[in-house]
Design a protein with these regions (language model features):
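C-terminal hydrophobic structural anchor segments
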Residues: 119-153
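Short glycine-rich, acidic/polar surface loops and turns
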Residues: 115-118, 156-162
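C-terminal outer-membrane beta-barrel translocator/porin domains of Gram-negative envelope proteins
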Residues: 1-126, 139
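A short, acidic, flexible beta-alpha connecting loop/helix-capping segment that sits on the rim
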Residues: 175-182
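Outer-membrane beta-barrel "beta-signal"
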Residues: 94, 98, 161-163, 182-193
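Flexible, surface-exposed loop regions and adjacent strand-edge segments
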Residues: 38, 70-78, 146-153, 190-193
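Short, contiguous acidic/charged loop-to-helix segments that flank catalytic cores in large enzymes
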Residues: 81-87, 143-152, 177
């Protein structure tokens, strides 16, 4: 892997990431079960100190008698799609984001004893928003469709907007809503982008 990214408070802001990997699995009897190959590249292109573009292209393939099923869908992998709603032994995913600051600070205050206990959860600093387009899909190898789905690549996409709200203890609330193509909404609590 190669990583030249420079990070800011919200995550990667400039640079590139390239990752490739191969994994092989055996079953309980020591016989070959599957081999997975993945390839991913990301590019972060700053516009200003706090805004910029993020691009991602990822693909994967699993072969063998019991191949891995890759799963996508939800806030971090194929926004606008149902959570874990895209699956198969092969996948291609591309995404492009425009990330911009929305609010430097927004908060609320309570009175009484709860004021100090709730303070970390009522202050939000450096809220970001933006627009995205995600495209791709997953499909099964020929003759291997255990859960239904496609055994050929059928492209799909979602374009919409997102909101990232950093909270106490380094966690981020992430909301996204597809407006064109797949129109799902997602909510996620986690860290980073």
């Amino acid at each position: 892997s190669l990583d030249t990214t420079v990070w800011n408070y919200h995550g990667p802001h400039s640079g590139n990431v390239f990752f490739t990997g191969t994994e092989m699995a055996v079953d309980s009897q020591g016989k070959f079960s599957s081999m997975d190959m993945i390839l991913e590249g990301r590019n972060y292109l700053p516009i200003t100190e706090r805004s910029g573009f993020a691009f991602r292209l990822a693909s994967g393939k699993s072969v063998g008698p019991d191949p891995t099923i890759f799963v996508m869908g939800g806030n971090k992998a194929f926004r606008g799609m149902p959570f874990l709603g895209v699956y198969g032994n092969n996948y291609i995913l591309g995404s492009a984001d425009l990330r911009v600051p929305l609010f430097d600070f927004i908060g609320a205050q309570t009175s009484g004893p709860s004021k100090h206990a709730l303070w970390p959860f009522m202050q939000f600093i450096d809220i970001q928003s933006g627009v995205y387009i995600d495209g791709g899909n997953a499909w099964y190898n020929k003759g291997q469709t255990p859960y239904g789905g496609n055994n050929t690549f059928v492209p799909d996409y979602s374009a919409g907007y997102f909101l990232n709200v950093p909270t106490a203890f380094g966690l981020t609330l992430r909301f996204s809503r597809g407006v064109y193509g797949q129109k799902g909404s997602t909510f996620w609590i986690g860290y980073n982008w």
